[in-house]
């Protein structure tokens, strides 16, 4: 609907509904939109209740309520922003009018429809409709009354004189009747002949245009009173007289008293239109309801703003949580890879006792996780921990036994060496051999003691490291010990004579 602008929409609505809208904001009353729905779906909207002359917001809201009811009946899923349309927002009214044009082009069947006749039939005309109606009635009404001429006013009198009233006995009268003969029938008419007597003539009759001319006949004498041009022409009917007295024709219409009004006199042939403007103030109840609805709308807007702020905060927190989760997953993968490498290394060198301890520590985590799941599982985890502690104690005891056995073997070897060194050799002198043997024995004892002390210190240091260090430090210490052992195995003695003797003995 981007091709339709404001002027095109206004021209389309004015031509279709025969209105005179000047701005697109006038569609905010909702009346024209309701009649568009009546054109597309006749009888599906309560058009009789729509106010085409609405001027206040609460009247606009009522019109839009009828529009929403019709949408609900027809199943039209269109959200109507009543608050924006009622405030005469140009963009909102233009967008809704464009949607109505699209809906009209899609569902209108092409049946003939006269918008003015429809509004007049439902008694909801606009101001333009009323003015056009008044113009039509003035054009198609009774023909305008022209000012009567004196000849036309005297014409019925002559006709009345030409037809004398029938009498039973012919009588003759004088040529000049007295004025009393004329005034008496007017002042005191007979009850049988006149339905309502006229006691006093109206001011319009008091000054006739022409003087009454008596007419003489052989049978009877009749006098006629001509009416002035300003009075309407009465229809005179002759009254039969039983006597030979002169008779006066009486009008058949009932004279009505003239009401004195401050309006200027009406000129014949002209039409006067009176327009009454009634300014009615809206009832207080509706105003209170409108104010209450405005308050509720403001409160709902505040709540929506608060909810929007809360939603923004939650989205920001969720984004931060996602970032932290990604960082944690990276750290987890990093440390898991390192632990896996350590596990593989320990499995490859499982003959080393320290690495066996490391493997036990690595495999001990499953029992702890299972122990956290329930009370029964906690008990099983405690039992496993006790078994592991017992196993560790057994391993320590075995290591201590091995150390004791090694010490005993070393002591036995030392004693054996001492015995072998204490025996004299036959090829050497008795004086020189004991001195050399004593020196060698002293050096061997010092060397053995120093070596035993170093082994004990290393053993205790290893135990302390295993108990107080983490996995990485344990791995580093194991690798360092292995390198130290390799250095010891690859080391050689010096080229001294004493060292060569010891080497031969070993």
Curated annotation (Swiss-Prot):
Keywords: Cell cycle, Cell division, Cell projection, Centromere, Chromosome, Coiled coil, Cytoplasm, Cytoskeleton, Kinetochore, Microtubule, Mitosis. Disruption phenotype: Defects in cytokinesis due to poor mitotic spindle assembly during mitotic prometaphase. Residues 303-371 form the EB1 C-terminal domain. Residues 127-268, 365-506 are annotated as: Disordered. Its main location: other. GO terms for molecular function: dynein complex binding; identical protein binding; microtubule binding; microtubule plus-end binding. Signal peptide: none annotated. SUPFAM superfamilies: Calponin-homology domain, CH-domain, EB1 dimerisation domain-like. InterPro entries: CH_dom (IPR001715), CH_dom_sf (IPR036872), EB1_C (IPR004953), EB1_C_sf (IPR036133), MAPRE (IPR027328). One of its GO terms (cellular component) is cytoplasmic microtubule. One of its GO terms (biological process) is protein localization to microtubule. Residues 367-403, 410-428, 453-474, 483-506 have a biased composition (Acidic residues). Involved in microtubule polymerization, and spindle function by stabilizing microtubules and anchoring them at centrosomes. Interacts with mtaA/CP224 at the microtubule tip, centrosome and kinetochore. This is Microtubule-associated protein RP/EB family member 1. It comes from Dictyostelium discoideum. The lineage of its organism: Eukaryota, Amoebozoa, Evosea, Eumycetozoa, Dictyostelia.
């Amino acid at each position: 609907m981007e091709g339709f602008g404001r002027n095109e929409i206004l021209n389309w609505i004015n031509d279709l509904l025969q209105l005179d809208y000047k701005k697109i904001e006038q569609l905010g009353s909702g009346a024209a939109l309701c009649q568009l729905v009546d054109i597309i779906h006749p009888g599906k909207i309560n058009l009789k209740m729509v106010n085409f002359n609405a001027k206040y917001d609460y009247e606009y809201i009522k019109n839009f309520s009828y529009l929403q009811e019709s949408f609900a009946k027809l199943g039209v899923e269109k959200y109507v922003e009543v608050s924006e349309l009622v405030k005469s927002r140009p963009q909102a009214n233009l967008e809704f009018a464009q949607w109505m044009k699209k809906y009209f082009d899609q569902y209108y069947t092409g049946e003939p429809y006269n918008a003015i006749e429809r509004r007049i039939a439902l008694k909801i005309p606009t101001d333009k409709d009323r003015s056009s109606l008044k113009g039509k009635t003035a054009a198609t009404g009774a023909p305008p009354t022209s000012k009567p001429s004196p000849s036309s006013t005297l014409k019925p009198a002559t006709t009345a004189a030409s037809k004398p009233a029938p009498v039973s006995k012919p009588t003759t009268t004088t040529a000049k009747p007295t004025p009393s003969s004329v005034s008496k029938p007017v002042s005191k008419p007979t009850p049988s002949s006149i339905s309502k007597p006229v006691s006093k003539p109206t001011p319009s009759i008091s000054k006739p245009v022409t003087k009454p001319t008596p007419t003489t006949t052989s049978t009877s004498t009749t006098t006629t009173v001509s009416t002035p041009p300003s009075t309407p022409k009465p229809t005179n009917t002759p009254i039969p007289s039983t006597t030979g007295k002169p008779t006066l024709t009486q009008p058949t219409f009932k004279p009505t008293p003239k009401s004195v009004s401050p309006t200027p006199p009406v000129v014949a042939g002209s039409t006067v239109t009176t327009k009454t403007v009634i300014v009615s103030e809206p009832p207080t109840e509706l105003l209170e309801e409108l104010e209450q609805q405005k308050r509720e709308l403001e409160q709902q807007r505040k709540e929506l703003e608060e909810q929007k702020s809360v939603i923004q905060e939650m989205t920001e927190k969720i984004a931060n949580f996602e970032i932290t989760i990604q960082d944690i997953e990276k750290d987890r993968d990093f440390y898991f890879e390192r632990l896996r490498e350590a596990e593989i290394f320990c499995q490859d060198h499982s003959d080393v006792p320290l690495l066996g301890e490391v493997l036990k520590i690595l495999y001990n985590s499953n029992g702890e996780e299972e122990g956290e799941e329930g009370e029964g599982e906690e008990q099983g985890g405690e039992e496993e921990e006790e078994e592991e502690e017992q196993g560790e104690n057994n391993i320590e005891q075995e290591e201590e036994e091995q150390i004791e056995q090694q010490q005993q073997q070393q002591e036995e070897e030392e004693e054996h060496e001492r015995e072998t060194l204490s025996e004299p050799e036959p090829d050497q002198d008795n004086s020189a051999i004991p001195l050399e043997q004593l020196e060698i024995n002293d050096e061997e004892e010092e060397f053995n003691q120093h070596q035993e002390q170093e082994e004990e210190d290393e053993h205790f240091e290893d135990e302390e490291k295993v108990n107080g260090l983490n996995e990485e430090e344990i791995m580093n210490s194991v690798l360092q010990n292995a390198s130290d052992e390799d250095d010891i195995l690859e080391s050689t003695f010096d080229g001294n004579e004493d060292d060569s003797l010891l080497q031969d003995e070993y």
